[in-house]
Amino acid sequence: MPNSTGKIAQVIGPVVDVAFPINGDLPEINNALTVAKKDGSQLVLEVALELGDGVMRTIAMDSTDGLQRNMAVQDTGGPISVPVGKDTLGRVFNVLGDPIDGGEAFGPDHRRDSIHRDAPKFEDLNTSSEILETGIKVIDLLEPYLRGGKVGLFGGAGVGKTVLIQELIHNIAEEHGGISVFTGVGERTREGNDLYFEMKESGVLENTAMVFGQMNEPPGARMRVALTGLTIAEYFRDVEGQDVLLFIDNIFRFTQAGSEVSALLGRIPSAVGYQPTLATEMGQLQERITSTKKGSVTSIQAIYVPADDYTDPAPATTFAHLDATTNLERRLTEQGIYPAVDPLESSSSALTPEIVGDEHYKVATEVQQVLQRYRELQDIISILGMDELSDEEKVVVARARRIQFFLSQNFNVAERFTGQPGSYVPVEETVKGFKAILDGKYDDYPEDAFRSVGRIEEVVEKAKKMGFAPDDQNTDADEKPAAQAAAN
């Protein structure tokens, strides 16, 4: 049966009402409609509401400039569908799956999947909790990511979000053979452009598909672009059996676009002006991000918090879905510690003995305790100086500073800037290194030897290059009293 044809009844900004014959087949909710504009371009509309008498209210995916009443509108017979598969890697798309990188377009025979899909069924889910090793010490030790989990990435401008994202993409591709999908939702076009060229230069673009719906685009495009990126990621999980990293920057803009669309559709707003369907829309997106028996989609979502108000409905609704948070702190960048992840503010639900093991959990909690004690002592140090501390407190400060520096490491994607080779550190090596520092085995080593290194063995090598010769009697500090270690 041919798909029905209607006519534009009215245009209100990005909202277009389309009248179809009452005795004909009406398009379903979420169906894509097309309008041939006079300039030769084609505008896609998505059905949002049925107003009655054959009139459907739709949301435009691009500018409605040039539309007129009574222009013909064709029902495509299905939702927006986007190209999927290995050919999407290294390419950049818009919300409709059209390439925007100047490359070759996909033919009509290429596989396309609908962006509106159900979450995986219960029987298809992988119920085991498995850690996704990133090779980044501070993440793997203190806020481990769950395979198929969701991570919130917090940080202001210039604290290293982009470099951290690039390193995660690099490590997942190199060590796990995984695929990444980057989705830019409602952010600056310039930032997306810069990210594309940076990823191209660092060599990670070939393992990445990129989808953008930037802040200059209509709210319909910004609301649906996250689903476009997720659909591409789901193909690699469900068909290729891959472990996929899905980056969403910024998940707040997804909510913001939904709020705009809701108001345009005439819905009564809820708390603080947000859409009444906020929790439903967020749930429909987040529940598709999960592990199945075939593969996994692990999501890392940059989150903007309006006015730093964590009780705002938009971030508060997102938090309910997160398994871990990674907080980037400007104070650490000022100290030259990269990645600038705050080890005390970041957290993960996976940091339990049942998931990471007893030794990992014990070392991680001891590291947090030492860093917390150091933070408490900093006020005393800044006012009275180190001399007023007890011998035991001096040991805590010394070890905390070494731990803080050892949490930093060089990134592979930053090697062309720093001239230093990057390092991928397995979880076992990370735990071993921090356990040795906590045990006092490296109390005598200079602090600078711990900066931007990978494994603990690199600390020894760096110290030797600095002219440091460790005393044999200090190599096993378990036998020394803490006060004596501080005195040395």
Swiss-Prot record:
Keywords: ATP synthesis, ATP-binding, Cell membrane, CF(1), Hydrogen ion transport, Ion transport, Membrane, Nucleotide-binding, Translocase, Transport. Residues 467-488 are annotated as: Disordered. It is a peripheral membrane protein. Its EC number is 7.1.2.2. It is found in: Cell membrane. It holds the Pfam family ATP-synt_ab_N. It catalyses: ATP + H2O + 4 H(+)(in) = ADP + phosphate + 5 H(+)(out). The keyword ATP-binding applies. ATP binds at residues 155-162. GO terms for molecular function: ATP binding; ATP hydrolysis activity; proton-transporting ATP synthase activity, rotational mechanism. GO terms for cellular component: plasma membrane; proton-transporting ATP synthase complex. The keyword tRNA-binding does not apply. Transmembrane segments: none annotated. InterPro entries: AAA+_ATPase (IPR003593), ATP-synt_VA_C (IPR055190), ATP_synth_F1_bsu (IPR005722), ATPase_a/bsu_AS (IPR020003), ATPase_alpha/beta_chains (IPR050053), ATPase_F1/V1/A1_a/bsu_N (IPR004100), ATPase_F1/V1/A1_a/bsu_N_sf (IPR036121), ATPase_F1/V1/A1_a/bsu_nucl-bd (IPR000194). It is an enzyme of class 7 (translocase). Its main location: membrane. Produces ATP from ADP in the presence of a proton gradient across the membrane. The catalytic sites are hosted primarily by the beta subunits. F-type ATPases have 2 components, CF(1) - the catalytic core - and CF(0) - the membrane proton channel. CF(1) has five subunits: alpha(3), beta(3), gamma(1), delta(1), epsilon(1). CF(0) has three main subunits: a(1), b(2) and c(9-12). The alpha and beta chains form an alternating ring which encloses part of the gamma chain. CF(1) is attached to CF(0) by a central stalk formed by the gamma and epsilon chains, while a peripheral stalk is formed by the delta and b chains. Belongs to the ATPase alpha/beta chains family. This is ATP synthase subunit beta. It comes from Lacticaseibacillus paracasei (strain ATCC 334 / BCRC 17002 / CCUG 31169 / CIP 107868 / KCTC 3260 / NRRL B-441) (Lactobacillus paracasei). The lineage of its organism: Bacteria, Bacillati, Bacillota, Bacilli, Lactobacillales.
